Amino acid sequence: KLHPGIKNERVHFILLPVCIIFVSVMEKFELHILGCGSALPTTRHFATSQVVNLRDKLFMIDCGEGAQMQLRKSRLKFSRLNHIFISHLHGDHCFGLMGLISTFGLLGRTAELHIHSPKGLEELFSPLLAFFCKNMSYQVVFHEFDTKEPVLIYEDRSMTVTTIPLQHRIPCCGFLFAEKPRPNHIIREMIDFYQVPVYELNRI
């Protein structure tokens, strides 16, 4: 059941540890599970992290310890990752951030890295960035939000990302990835003029 603030639209959904992603049907959609473990490390599971590939734009959801190692194994291009979404401030969902941020700096990244999270992450990470990541070639931009209500936290010309309030021991949310409706490319007058059969319209 969707939160009352989320429109009840037709979407596919994927259940992940703590985080729930809803996505509409898109031209290209890939989900890479980098880690699905809990707080205690094991030899078989990395801590929680997923990467969504939407039309070759990469969006990371949570960044547990070891996320960047798994990112390399998945052969995903670091340069296409510009937005990271953190569901809540437990360590197994964000301990991998510092290593990833540092690696981006060593690789000579220049594009901004946007980190979206519940309130409190910037306060936690700012001293670490100031100590370990001085004079980086790029800027880390924090975007903090309230998890009590759905909030639009990302938008481009083809899609939006909205938070979904979730119940957990601390403030927590999932993320709704939704494709924007495309403009109608069928001109009714031309359909009538050329008498295009209805069964052919789906192919246009």
What are the residue ranges of the model-derived segments?
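Metal-dependent phosphodiesterase/nuclease catalytic metal-binding core
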Residues: 146-204
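Active-site metal-binding motif and surrounding structural segment of the metallo-beta-lactamase
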Residues: 65-116, 144-146
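Conserved beta-strand hairpin/beta-sheet module of binuclear metal-dependent hydrolase folds
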Residues: 21, 26-74, 112, 175-177, ...
